[in-house]
Amino acid sequence: MKKNLRYFALLGLTALSLASCYKECTYAEFIESAKKVESVEYTKATFSGKYVYEAAGVTSTLDMSGTEFTKESGSWKASDSNKATQSVFGLVLLAFKPADIEEDTSGKTKYFYNDGFKVESTEDDKTSIAEWDNFGYLTSMSFDGNTVTVSYTK
């Protein structure tokens, strides 16, 4: 009996996870769906994660953990003005919407939608992934093993 319960529980969890998975689609389907997102207003966005990058032989780390933004008069404002680089990077990410994605005709980009939106692009053995919720708000940005996530509060 316990085995049957575990089996049905596992089957149920699998069905739930498959129901909320992204579905690969064409660019036209992706952009059409992205233009029809429902409107919701979040009042707070909190970032987590680090972005490590190298330029001209110098490695830098941008730690976004704990960086917060509040929405005032329709615009995102950084909660800590002492984190200038995090504030600028965060504002750019908060403004990035799925409807802003341009079509990549090289075949290196895949588009997904269903329970939110996702774009996955691979070039020079480096993969970048952007994910948005159903309302078009960025929830995750990954590049070359670095991931920055955003959580929202209404």
Q: Which residues are covered by each model-predicted region?
A:
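An acidic-aromatic
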Residues: 48-103, 147
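N-terminal leader/targeting segments and the immediate start of mature chains
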Residues: 15-50, 91-94, 105, 115, ...
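N-terminal compositionally biased, intrinsically disordered segments and leader/signal-like regions
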Residues: 15, 27, 44-47, 60-62, ...
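Gly/Pro-enriched, hydrophobic low-complexity segments
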Residues: 58, 63, 110-154
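Serine/proline-rich low-complexity intrinsically disordered segments, especially terminal tails, linkers
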Residues: 16-22, 41, 50, 62, ...
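Sec-dependent bacterial lipoprotein signal peptides
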Residues: 1-20
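Intrinsically disordered, low-complexity segments enriched in Ser/Pro/Gly/Ala and basic residues
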Residues: 16-19, 32, 38, 59, ...
